[in-house]
């Protein structure tokens, strides 16, 4: 397995402390990787800064060609990437290969095209004898911090728009799941000029802090927890860096009496538990109107009970393990606290799976109340709660009564209600009669403590640029 860092176009061993990388399906150590030293972090940033002098001036066509080559290489090595992701994250191999790899390839291809469509505005004469123009230029060095739930996909979401806009990147994947990012570094080094892409390994304190706080880093992009986002915003404040934050969610799933219950059950069974629920848009906070509450709980409980967790290389496996032992304990604690309320009922699941690996049973909890922690706090595991509501006004207020604002869905056959409710929801995305669907052309991002900035789409590309005014006297 490729375990070296990419700094200034060269694969080099880390000079810092070694950290174990685990297989969450077994709990075994896959390998140990040495972290980047402080000197290597500095070298990576300075290499990116030096490379920016030329990369930032390349044509969109030239940048697009590099991105397309990288997309092709990822596609050609799709099985290798899927196997690494499966071993390091515990994802079902078939899901990694069939779902994630094509989406990752598409992100690079989309931004290759988008790079050639990014324009400033040719304005007019707002002052006599002077012509004004608006430019969208790259910022410089971007420090990108990727999470452990979708390591390669989140690396793609960060690398593609930043590079397409003409920036240079220093990427730090999670120390829990670094293997696909390190493999990507190996394949990218011969496609991009030295220093344009740099990939480091290490923990937040030892590598993340010196990276994000480096004076030559002009922007920090994070997908992670609220706590990590708060830390980075505070840490980077003295140098006034631009920050781009995607900090998780607790998606409300609003099911009205007239909804297609079978579609809801099928949707939540899939979209509430995909990736073992380790998804910031997971359909995890159901609000069911009183007329269909009992029916939905009964049918959804039966459906969730059929979900199969097992070995990642088994084609019949639907849920793999959680990503780490520490996270397994967090999920278990959240469910135990829900049980202890006395009014929340475990419909199915609610316990760790016996044996090796970090497995937690697919869990459905009914009878949850609006103020319960299981409703208000992100669990980030295969755990879905159901809360009864009376009317539209109540459920909109409850759905918005959350520190999160990333994703939501509304299930109803009433078109007017669908438009009315979706317009009032304080979330970056609202799906109607579906959930979880993402495409490269549409923006993904939140509000409130879910963060700000957009991934994917032309809006995502613009986030990695600075708007400049040029005035010419004539």
Swiss-Prot record:
Top enzyme category: oxidoreductase
Annotated family: Belongs to the aldehyde dehydrogenase family. Gamma-aminobutyraldehyde dehydrogenase subfamily.
HAMAP family referenced in this protein's UniProt entry, alphabetically: Aldedh_Prr
Annotated catalytic residues: 246, 280 (nucleophile)
Catalytic reaction list: 4-aminobutanal + NAD(+) + H2O = 4-aminobutanoate + NADH + 2 H(+); 5-aminopentanal + NAD(+) + H2O = 5-aminopentanoate + NADH + 2 H(+)
GO BP of this protein: L-lysine catabolic process; putrescine catabolic process
EC number, UniProt record: 1.2.1.19, 1.2.1.-
Gene name in the database record: patD
Binding site for NAD(+): 146-148, 172-175, 209, 225-228, 280
Protein name: Gamma-aminobutyraldehyde dehydrogenase
Pathway as given in its UniProt record: Amine and polyamine degradation; putrescine degradation; 4-aminobutanoate from 4-aminobutanal: step 1/1; Amino-acid degradation
Segments forming a coiled coil: none
Cytoplasm among keywords: no
Top-rank taxon, per record: Bacteria
This protein's UniProt keywords: NAD, Oxidoreductase
Annotated InterPro entries: Ald_DH/histidinol_DH (IPR016161), Ald_DH_C (IPR016163), Ald_DH_CS_GLU (IPR029510), Ald_DH_N (IPR016162), Aldehyde_DH_dom (IPR015590), Aminobutyraldehyde_DH (IPR015657), PatD (IPR017749)
Stated role: Catalyzes the oxidation 4-aminobutanal (gamma-aminobutyraldehyde) to 4-aminobutanoate (gamma-aminobutyrate or GABA). This is the second step in one of two pathways for putrescine degradation, where putrescine is converted into 4-aminobutanoate via 4-aminobutanal. Also functions as a 5-aminopentanal dehydrogenase in a a L-lysine degradation pathway to succinate that proceeds via cadaverine, glutarate and L-2-hydroxyglutarate.
NCBIfam families documented for this protein: ABALDH (TIGR03374), PRK13473.1 (NF010000)
A Pfam family assignment: Aldedh
Subunit structure: Homotetramer.
A GO molecular-function annotation: aminobutyraldehyde dehydrogenase (NAD+) activity
Remarks, miscellaneous: 4-aminobutanal can spontaneously cyclize to 1-pyrroline, and 5-aminopentanal to 1-piperideine.
